[in-house]
């Protein structure tokens, strides 16, 4: 009887995996097909990223370099058509969707991971950005890889996952400096959850940070020799020189998150977070919340003090889809 139950469980898991991969493949194929037939010209940022891809460097005025490298690869293979410039977006989103599913499977089991992958794939912001090229796309991909690697480190303590975490952190930072939130969230998660505190004093964290620093160091040197151009631009974006009390901007940012995540899902997320904060949540749920709430709170504060774009908290929704 036990053997039959195990076989049935294995069959269900295989069926769910097959269905998830099928859905991801179908959505990705449809999105690529729509890109191929689209007449949409490159908008301002996309055109700028494409121009960077023609002159590869370790950094640029407004962004780190990875977006230019990605475009360089796709246009080298397929030419400089608009669809080729944007081709990496649906492909990377497919990878992020799979990583989100694996995160949910590790935390909550086999029953939810199928829907987690599908939910991420069909989020309004993900659907929209699949037809554009932006720095958020590779950022979300490497964030999801880093989150899964972190989960595996805490579970297995294997060195290989620390190496993967360092690579994901480094490439994420080369995508967009918002990857730095991951360090804040991880520090908070490990400090709050007693059984994870060992990580903060382990060689795993040193290895991960060292690898990330090696990967990001050329961009740091580029910034140094370029008068900290990108850092200055980030400071201009933060813009704390004006009115520091903008309740309307904070409210507007929070309202825009319903458009990013979807109004129904955003409502469900708020209800879930309130429920977890009011009741006794598990360590796994607390851990996941640490990769959601701090980001939304930091960017909401930024909106209150100055302004914030709707996508600035995008990485929070990797964990949110699993929650």
Locations of regions flagged by a protein language model:
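Hydrophobic/aromatic-rich transmembrane helices and adjacent perimembrane loops
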Residues: 56, 260-263, 286-291, 295, ...
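Short helix- or helix-capping micro-motifs
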Residues: 24-27, 116-124, 169, 173, ...
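Transmembrane-lumen/periplasm boundary regions of multi-pass, lipid-linked membrane glycan transferases
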Residues: 38, 171, 182-282, 292-295, ...
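Membrane-interface alpha helices of multi-pass inner-membrane proteins
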Residues: 55, 116, 161-177, 212-213, ...
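Membrane-interface transmembrane helices that cradle and orient dolichyl/undecaprenyl
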Residues: 105-111, 146-161
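Short acidic/glycine- and proline-prone juxtamembrane loop motifs at membrane-interface regions
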Residues: 125-139
